[in-house]
C-alpha cells in the first residue's frame, strides 16, 4: 500500500517538497580535513554577549546543524484541545548534541516568524544596506521551505512519516545561515551565545523562563514577607550547564546571576514547593531560585533535565568530600613546589606571559609595582605592566583584594585598586568586605586560564621576594652609593627609576624590615622608607605551589564563588562593567594550554577556610586535614608556620592541632616508636616594635599565645609531655627558628629569617601547603578566609626511614630535602645525608646544629629573643652590654665561620617571668582576644 501526502495530512496540510529545494550556502562549508571543534566559539565570548534579538553569531560558521525528530509523545493537556503530540528533536552541531521538545504549533510559529523576517529583509533599501546586509539580502531571495497551515495533531496515523517531513523541513532551514542565525530560530532550537563554547561543557539546557526575585541566603538579601508584593517576576533566558546555571537579560544579553551547584543543590517541581503554578525550585547553599514555566509538562521536563545535568561532570560539587572539602581529591595532578619567593614569582611571571583568556588574583596584600624577576633591568617583569600588556591583548584580569581597616593596617588596598583599574578596562578589581570586621581575606591565589593555579603563603607584595641566600643588605653596585639608583625625596616617587644599570634586588618599598618599621606611603613605591645604609632587611622565607588541570579548576571555582558573591552583595559592583565569572567544565580540564616545568604527578585536594561573610558558605577543611594528617602520621611531622597558636582550652583557643601532636607523641612513647616532630617558627612575630624593650603590644600578645601553646601553662604541649615522660620529650620534638648574618658598613650584622610558610610534611608522602596559619583565625573557617592543598604522593622512590628502606613520595621527599638542605647549609656540608629524617644520628645532628648556631649568634650579637632574658629587667641589662660584633668585628667574623646553615633553637624561656598579654589599660588590650588567636 502506497502512502501519499494526502494520507499524512488529510486536511491538505502536506509539505510541498519542491519548495524545499535550496542552493548550497557557501558560508556553511567546512574545509576538507578541518576539525569542527576549531570553529567553535572561544571562551572569551562570555565577556561579549549581545542582546538575544540582535542576531548574534550563535552557531559556529561552517559547522552544520543536523536535526533528527527521534520520537513523539502524546499527552492530554487537560484543556478543550484534547490530546496533543510532542515531537522530540535531537540536534547536533559539531561535538554538541541536545534535545528539545516541540508541539506542531511551535513549528508553525517559527514558520510565520521566518516568513516575516524574509519579507522584511526583501523590503529593505538595497542601497542603504548594501555593505552590511549583502549576504543576508541574497539569502532572503531564496525560497523558504513551506510548512502546512495546520495539522491534525490528534491523529496518530503514519507518525513516522510526519516526523520525517518535519525533520526535512528543519534541516533545509538549517543549511541557510540567513534563517539559522535569526533569533526566532535560535529560540526555537533553545540555543544562545553560550551554547557552543567547549570549555563550558555540554550544550546543557536553555530557554525563556520567568524567574522570581529574592531567595538569596546571604545577609541583607532575605525578605521577611511571603506575599506577592515582596517579589516580582521577570523574563529571563536561562542557561544550565553541568556545574552551574545562569540567567541573562534578553534585551541586553547581560548575565544577571550565576548559581553554582553545591551540596545544597536540590530541584523541586510543583506549587507546594514553589508557591507558583508550573514552578521549578532550584536550591543551593546560596539561593533558592524559583522559575515559572508555561506548563506542568515543561516544569517537569526542566526539573528532570537540570537534575541530570548536575549529575554529569560537575557532580563532584554536589557533596562534601574527604575532610568535608567542597572539592574531591584529584589523582594525576601535576604539581610543583617553590621554596622562597624568587622561583615562585618567576614562575608566576611566566604563567602571566602565557595567559590567553583570564587571570584571577586574590591576595591579602598586592603591590602593583612589584618586580617578578630580579634584578630588574626594565619594566618587562613588573606586575602592573605585565597585567596591562595582557589586558591590551584581550585577557580579562579579575582581582579580589582584602579591604582592610585603614586605622589598623597600612596595606592601602585602595591605592592598589585605583592603580590597577586605571591601566585598562579589562582589569577589574573588587575589594571586600565593606563593613568593619575582625577578620580578613588571607588567601593568596593566582589562576591563569582556569588551568594553572598558584597558591601558598606568598602575596604578590613588597618584602616577599627572596632566595636561598637570604641577603641582609642590598646596596646595588658597590661602586655606586645606594641613593644614586633610588628616587630622592625631591623626585617623582611614582616614576620608575632608570633600571638600565640597576643592580638592586629590592627597589624602594621592597627593601623592608617589618619589625624595625612597618610599611608607609605605599603610593610612593620607589622611595625607600628605611635606611638601607644602616638597617639590614629582614629575609622572608615562604613556600608556594602550582597545580594544573582539574585541581586548578577547583581553585578557579573558589575564586569565582567569592567574586560572584562579592558582586551580588555589594551594590557598587552590580553594574555590567563588573561581569559575573563562569567556571570552566571539568570535562576539558586535561587540555592544558601550558605547564610549569619541574612538576610531579600526585593526588591533590583543594582545602579552604571560609564562612558566610567571606564566601557565602562555611567550610573548615584545612583544619580537618591537619588533624587527620597528624593523627595518621607514622614516622615524622615537619611543620613550618608563621604562627603556632593551638591546644584548645574550649574558651580562648579552639583548634586542636597542638592536642593532636601531643596525642601522637604520647602514642609513640607508649608503643616505643621512633617518632619525630620538627617545628619551625619565626623567632619573633612580624609586627613593628622595639624588642630591646620587650617589643610592642602586638609582639607580646602573639608571643603570649605562642608560648601558651608550646611550653607555658597546663594546656601547653611541653607541659603535657613532661607530665607523661619527663625530659624524654626532647627525643620526640624539636622547636626551632632561623637566623642569618652578613656585613653592613664594615661590621657583622645578624637578623632573623622571617618564616611565613604554611607547610606540613608527614612521612615523606603527604604535604599540606597553603595560606593558613596554625591558629583559630585561619583554621576555624568562621574567621579568616584561607586556601590550601593536600598533596598525597603516588610516585615513589627509594629512601630511608629510621634506618630501614622506605618508599618515599617524590613530591614530599624533594620538598623536605630542599628545606633541610637550605636550613642545615648542605652546600658547605658535602657528606650530609638528608634521606632519613627519623634516625637518631640525624635528629641529634639537627639538635646540635641548632644549639651550636644559637650559642654562636648569642655570643657575637647578643641577639634577641634569648633564653638569657627571662624578665624585662634582665632584658635591659642584657642589651646594655655591647656585643662582640661591635667591639671586635674581626674576631666576630672568624667565629661566624663556624655557623652552619640557619637553624637555631627557639628560645622557650624568653620573658617567661613576665605577663605578655596586653593589659586592659593599653589600646591593644581593648582588642578582643580572638584577634590574636
UniProtKB/Swiss-Prot annotation:
One of its GO terms (molecular function) is phospholipase D activity. Signal peptide: none annotated. It is an enzyme of class 3 (hydrolase). Residues 437-464, 751-778 form the PLD phosphodiesterase domain. It comes from the Eukaryota. Keywords: Cell membrane, Hydrolase, Lipid degradation, Lipid metabolism, Lipoprotein, Membrane, Phosphoprotein, Repeat. One of its GO terms (biological process) is receptor-mediated endocytosis. Stimulated by phosphatidylinositol 4,5-bisphosphate and phosphatidylethanolamine. Inhibited by phosphatidylserine and by oleate. Is not responsive to ADP-ribosylation factor 1 (ARF1), nor to GTP-binding protein RhoA. Residues 203-311 form the PH domain. It is a lipid-anchor. It holds the Pfam family PX. GO terms for cellular component: brush border membrane; caveola; cytoplasmic vesicle; lamellipodium; plasma membrane; sarcolemma. It catalyses: a 1,2-diacyl-sn-glycero-3-phosphocholine + H2O = a 1,2-diacyl-sn-glycero-3-phosphate + choline + H(+); 1,2-dihexadecanoyl-sn-glycero-3-phosphocholine + H2O = 1,2-dihexadecanoyl-sn-glycero-3-phosphate + choline + H(+). Phosphorylated by FGR. Phosphorylated on Tyr-11; most likely by EGFR. Expressed in brain, lung, heart, kidney, stomach, small intestine, colon, and testis, and at a much lower levels in thymus, liver and muscle. The modification Phosphotyrosine is found at residue 11. Residues 441-788 are annotated as: Catalytic. Its EC number is 3.1.4.4. InterPro entries: PH-like_dom_sf, PH_domain, PLD-like_dom, PLipase_D/transphosphatidylase, PLipase_D_euk, PLipase_D_fam, PX_dom, PX_dom_sf. It is found in: Cell membrane. Interacts with PIP5K1B. Interacts with EGFR. Function as phospholipase selective for phosphatidylcholine. May have a role in signal-induced cytoskeletal regulation and/or endocytosis. Belongs to the phospholipase D family. This is Phospholipase D2. It comes from Rattus norvegicus (Rat).
